[in-house]
Amino acid sequence: MNLSLFTLALVACYSSQLAAAHTVFTTLFVNDVSQGDGTCVRMPSDPSTATFPINDLDSDSMACGFNGTRGVERVCAVNQTAKLSFLFREYADASQQGAIDPNHKGPCAVYMKRVASAINDTAVGSGWFKIWDEGYDNSTQKWCTEKLIQNNGYLSINIPSDLAGGYYLARPELLALHQADKNPPNPQFYTGCAQIYLDSAETAIPKDTVNIPGYVNIHSPSVLYNIWNPPPTPYTMAGPAPYQPGISSISNTTGSKAAKFSAYTAQQNEGLLPQDAAITNANWWGVEVASYTTEAGCWDASSDCWNQTTVCYDCAPPTGDKGCREWEAHCTAIQKGCEGGSFTGPPVIVKTEGAMTMAMTATIAPAAEQTGGVYAASSTVVSVGSLGVSEDGKCGDGNGQTCKGSLLGECCSQVGYCGSSESYCGVGCQGNFGVCG
């Protein structure tokens, strides 16, 4: 296996990305916990253009960004009224700091769309409703994007309290107006989508929805506003007014269509991380190879491991490939064992410092106001009794950490990771290191 092929291809991709950076939504935080770079996020697949703006306001890219009609394999679970934070980066892989160029001034908004499948829905078309927006703040004399820069790229909102449970696409949007005064005008949109499952017993469905693309066009005043020579009239946000719980909604408990929609989203059944996932990178996960005690078994395991490595690199998003490189190191160890006559394995996976394993980093941000806003994040570590409360997603005998009290879920799975779904809390759950059942 010539590993340099992976390295050369990635260097070429990331070098081209550095040439022209704007911004891209890379990471979803749920209640201040990072779900991992690229995890549950629809984002552009080409690193060289991932941060480029959407200039065609009539294109399907307006829904969830470039390549946004294709879903990813993971869906992140969120609870009722959860705080969602969307991280924007000027460089998708965080190779350099920055959220967006200070010159790119303009408004922000967050939309949601209830869907039958967060993975399979194309996102294009009707059903989108706005839950928050902010344009120019007269009190601070700053545009929303300027606040975003001040807060290291974090934009945070609370999910409306009465939204019906089920699958949703959550869509943060930035609009840069620095070239809106040109001829022809060049408003620049930056957006992406997070695939989420809302665990809620509430029943409200917003009735005031719009089409994306379609809610705004090149003739809309909101995209032609001259920020360098502002008119006397205040800026008007694009799209509908934000949804207000209990006011602009209907119940989903009436009507055959609503009843059917409610029935098959009563419990999350797609996009879950398998219990046997050993390492993740964005929406990919590696499954440990079968145990072996013979030379043939060793080489079979090596082949399986390298095949998974190829898939990981092939589907790695512009946010990077840290988990792939960690998995690659595991495959190298297996291969060297086979070559050296060590036919018992596989060896224990060695996780390198800072690798994107389980894609879960406990990161705490200041509490979000009910109307949303932009906030910076900081980290925290807590411990209880003789066991430390897990902040990296790992638990069990090997590391002395419990999931009890963890932001990542209170159940410790059979393979030693924290979570809250049946895969973590059911068969094999380690009761000594968390809650089961």
Curated annotation (Swiss-Prot):
Q: What positions does the domain Chitin-binding type-1 occupy?
A: 392-437
UniProt remark on cofactor binding: Binds 1 copper ion per subunit.
Q: Which InterPro entries match?
A: AA9, AA9_LPMO, Chitin-bd_1, Endochitinase-like_sf
The Gene Ontology biological process annotation of the record reads: cellulose catabolic process
Which Pfam families would you find in this protein's record?
Answer: AA9
Q: What induces it?
A: Expression is slowly increased in cellulose-inducible conditions (in Avicel- and wheat bran-containing complex medium).
Which compartments is it annotated to reside in? Secreted
The coenzyme or cofactor needed here is: Cu(2+)
Applied uses, from the record? Lignocellulose is the most abundant polymeric composite on Earth and is a recalcitrant but promising renewable substrate for industrial biotechnology applications. Together with cellobiose dehydrogenases (CDHs) an enzymatic system capable of oxidative cellulose cleavage is formed, which increases the efficiency of cellulases and put LPMOs at focus of biofuel research.
Gene Ontology CC, one term: extracellular region
- Which pairs of positions does the record mark as disulfide bonds? C64-C193, C395-C412, C403-C418, C411-C425, C429-C436
- Keywords from the UniProt entry: Carbohydrate metabolism, Cellulose degradation, Chitin-binding, Copper, Disulfide bond, Glycoprotein, Metal-binding, Monooxygenase, Oxidoreductase, Polysaccharide degradation, Secreted, Signal
What residues does O2 bind to?
H178, Q188
Write the Enzyme Commission number(s) for this entry: 1.14.99.56
Per UniProt, where does Cu(2+) bind? H22, H104, Y190
User: What's an example of a GO molecular-function annotation for this chain?
Assistant: monooxygenase activity
Q: Which reaction does it catalyse?
A: [(1->4)-beta-D-glucosyl]n+m + reduced acceptor + O2 = 4-dehydro-beta-D-glucosyl-[(1->4)-beta-D-glucosyl]n-1 + [(1->4)-beta-D-glucosyl]m + acceptor + H2O
Family listed: Belongs to the polysaccharide monooxygenase AA9 family.
Designated name of the protein: AA9 family lytic polysaccharide monooxygenase H
Q: Which source organism? A: Botryotinia fuckeliana (strain B05.10) (Noble rot fungus)
Gene behind this protein: AA9H
